[in-house]
Amino acid sequence: MSEWKKNDKFETVIEDISETGEGIGKTDGFTWFIKDTVIGDRVEAKAMKTKKSYGFARMERILEPSKNRVEPKCPVARQCGGCQLQAMDYKEQLTFKERKIYNNLTRIGGFTEIPMLPIIGMDEPWRYRNKAQFPWGMDKEDNIITGFYAGRTHSIIGCEDCLLGIEENEDILKIIKAHMERFGLRLYDEETHKGLIRHTLIRKGFKTGELMVCQVINGKSLPHQEELVEELLKIPGMTSISYSVNREKTNVIMGNQVENLYGPGYISDYIGDVKYRISPLSFYQVNPVQTEKLYGTALEYAGLTGGETVWDLYCGIGTISLFLAQKAKKVYGVEIVPQAIEDARENAKLNGMENVEFFVGKAEEVLPEQFEKNQVYADVIVVDPPRKGCDEVCLDTIVKMGPKRVVYVSCDSATLARDLKYLAERGYELSRVRGCDMFPHSGHVETVALLTLV
Ligand code: SAH
């Protein structure tokens, strides 16, 4: 055990930021994780919980602020669990993310020369989210409030106007709150599993201006629906109003079923020239502006001239597949979630694209099977796996198929580095790497890498 005890005070300088956004400082070789700090801050902190070689501490006082420290724009930035980097100047956030990618590629990937292009940041890193799910609760004076969960808890921090979200959120939430008060609707209580009103889902198509509201309820129907619809329709752009029944004791927000109250049951949006239909339950990237840049980069790296056969592994609802299909002869998508593939096929039809075909299944099963049985071929393979990266069987099959180019889109640069190393040891050369900031003020960063067969 360390000699540190709870509530011990100490001084340290923040040198780095953890995966989850805490500042990292040291005292005589002991490592501290301290929330709400920025690289370069000299702080006084208080020990909360200690292990053998590291501990968690609470920031008590900033003794000397980092030159990159800024006043968070959002008044609840410190309590809310949503943003980790708001106190860091946006330029510095981008530098931090770029360095994270670079460090992982050198430390884990073993690369010495990294052909890195400047990270793609946002010109305006606020109000970029097209989707929000607001929980409802009571404050100490028994007022109805909504906002966001404080980090790692279910206590609600009141905030109707998150600065990452759209401006319409606030007006929509006011209408829903007024409706609850007017008709005495009860809030859902997680502990007793009683009460009706659960989360409110709000989505917007940034290119179309279309708005969607879906109210989640613990009950069969939403009382006084007509009055609610009438009020919500006063908001310009309101296109789809529905409710979702979720009677389970669960942290999952949406129920499986959606009942339509107004409109076609979906909204539409575009990424580039490709149109997407978004229903309350369908997956859609939350930052459409950066998604367009990210997929634009993937498309550029794919180097398509119109004659290529492309595989898009981990394709989700086919966003990248359809983007590529604009410039390829044929695109095959593979995704494990059947519902996502239904959406992908629907979106292909919506855009009149006939040169795409989708498979439901694991990439590491579908690809080897198609390769061994049907000798399928690829000029280019694009992968966009979840955080854990690609399965080795999948990488191995890619190597066997020997496409000229592999484009790797990643949301975790540590597993990216591991997988790139595997491919680089088997005939591929790392030709380009570029970060893209999809989630300003959070610690996350997306990366696109291009590998070329040598
Ligand atoms: N490119 C997609 C998003 C990819 S997110 C888009 O833009 O919509 C990663 C996707 O991989 C998720 O949809 C997830 O369901 C899927 N997935 C996870 N494990 C998988 C596996 N073993 N094989 C295929 N798909 C998988």
Role assignments for model-derived ranges:
Residues S2-E11, E19, K220, H224-I235, ...:
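Rossmann-like S-adenosyl-L-methionine
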Residues K46-T50, P135-D139, R203-K207, V454:
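Short beta-strand micro-motifs enriched in acidic
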Residues E60-P72, R78-L187, K207, L222:
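Extended interfacial segments that mediate partner engagement and assembly in macromolecular machines
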Residues T200:
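Flexible loop/N-cap segments at domain edges
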